[in-house]
């Protein structure tokens, strides 16, 4: 009876559609894969910590076997291998060429650091008068020395000769001058040479030694080594000379001292300025011209203070005025007196005539109203 009822229900078309729709909309369940490791399981809402694996302890036999295998691999790798492709060889060559180029800058920096360190050692040895250390640092590398620069300078432009002269080390000064240390025109940042530094420190004999070092006397070996040269004429000394060191000789320097002394004109430039120091370092004397023989302009170049807003060439050029004034000089900001224009003068004259006419009329009316 139940089976026949079910057959009648399924025979209805609408009920058959509902049954098929219900079967299609039934949700599909997700099948979860159980955890294979017990450490991944969650218990009581918390994940269980993983068990750390104990690292194997390397005993002596294992270490010996490892090194023997490593040596065997090195010996086997020394066997000739097959030729690499051309592309791989080009890549390796390009990589090797690029690496030294990238390492060029640090090498240059290291070279500069070594040069500065060598200069500091030479200056210290000259100041202490250590001739043994000076010979070791200044002798060429072919002779077993370090090959240092005898005219090396520090940040304050001090040379080894300046340090030795300032410290009064006569033996070191004589050795440096004998090796050809330069001092003519070589000044520090304050414009002082080695002779002046020795005089300031109270060593006049060292200063005299420095000034007389470039005389015309020569040692016998230098006389035999010198070759005859053509005679030349010196305009400063007014005589002919054949010595190549004539311009640094005592006679030439004395003839230069007979020149007209520089004038004491104020330049308006402090002696501590970098430009003044550069001129002194180049051999310039204060007050003399800027030419090689002390000729040329000695005063500042006249300039013009442009105080208006007119274009260039609008009016006649004003008189040049030197702008190198001293401190707190009121002439630097003083201007010319204002000159009124013609239109301004005519307006003032008209107002004056009108005021005069009103005064005459006022006096006339006052006179006519008087009773005698």
From Swiss-Prot:
Q: Which PANTHER family match?
A: BAT4 PROTEIN-RELATED (PTHR20923), G PATCH DOMAIN AND ANKYRIN REPEAT-CONTAINING PROTEIN 1 (PTHR20923:SF1)
Region annotated Disordered sits at 74-110, 211-233, 251-271, 330-357
Q: Please report the stretch or stretches of sequence annotated as the G-patch domain.
A: 271-317
Name the keywords, alphabetized. ANK repeat, Isopeptide bond, Repeat, Ubl conjugation
What is the annotated signal peptide range for this record?
none
Can you locate the Glycyl lysine isopeptide (Lys-Gly) (interchain with G-Cter in SUMO2) cross-link? Answer: 306
Q: State the organism named in the record.
A: Mus musculus (Mouse)
UniProt cross-references to Pfam families, sorted A to Z: Ank_2 (PF12796), G-patch (PF01585)
One GO molecular function term of this record is: nucleic acid binding
User: Which gene underlies this protein?
Assistant: Gpank1
- Bias category Basic and acidic residues: which stretches? 330-340, 348-357
* Protein name (record): G patch domain and ankyrin repeat-containing protein 1
């Amino acid at each position: 009876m139940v089976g026949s009822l079910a057959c009648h229900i399924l025979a209805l078309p609408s009920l058959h559609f509902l049954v098929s729709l219900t079967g299609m909309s039934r949700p599909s369940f997700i099948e979860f894969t159980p955890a294979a490791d017990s450490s991944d399981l969650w218990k009581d809402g918390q994940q269980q910590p993983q068990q750390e694996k104990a690292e194997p302890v390397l005993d002596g036999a294992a270490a010996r076997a490892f090194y023997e295998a490593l040596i065997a691999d090195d010996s086997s790798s020394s066997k000739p291998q097959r030729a690499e492709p051309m592309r791989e060889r080009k890549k390796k060559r390009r990589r090797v060429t690029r690496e030294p180029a990238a390492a060029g800058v640090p090498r240059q920096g290291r070279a500069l650091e070594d040069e500065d360190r060598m200069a500091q050692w030479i200056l210290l040895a000259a100041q202490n008068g250590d001739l043994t250390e000076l010979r070791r640092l200044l002798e060429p590398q072919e002779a077993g020395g370090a090959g240092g620069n005898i005219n090396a300078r520090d940040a304050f432009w001090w040379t080894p000769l300046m340090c030795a002269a300032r410290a009064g080390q006569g033996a070191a000064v004589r050795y440096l001058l004998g090796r050809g240390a330069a001092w003519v025109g070589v000044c520090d940042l304050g414009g002082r040479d080695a002779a002046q530094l020795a005089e300031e420190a109270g060593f006049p004999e060292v200063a005299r030694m420095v000034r007389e070092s470039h005389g015309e006397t020569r040692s016998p070996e230098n006389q035999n080594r010198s070759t005859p040269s053509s005679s030349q004429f010196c305009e400063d000394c007014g005589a002919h000379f054949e010595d190549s060191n004539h311009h640094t000789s005592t006679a030439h320097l004395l003839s230069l001292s007979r020149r007209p002394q520089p004038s004491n004109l104020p330049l308006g430039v402090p002696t501590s300025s970098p430009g003044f120091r550069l001129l002194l370092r180049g051999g310039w004397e204060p007050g003399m011209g800027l030419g090689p023989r002390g000729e040329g302009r000695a005063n500042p170049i006249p300039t013009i203070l442009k105080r208006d807003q007119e274009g260039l060439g609008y009016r006649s050029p004003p008189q040049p005025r030197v702008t190198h004034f001293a401190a707190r000089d009121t002439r630097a900001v003083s201007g010319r007196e204002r000159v009124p224009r013609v239109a301004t003068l005519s307006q003032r004259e008209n107002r004056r005539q009108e005021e005069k006419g009103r005064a005459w009329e006022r006096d006339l009316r006052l006179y006519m109203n008087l009773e005698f």
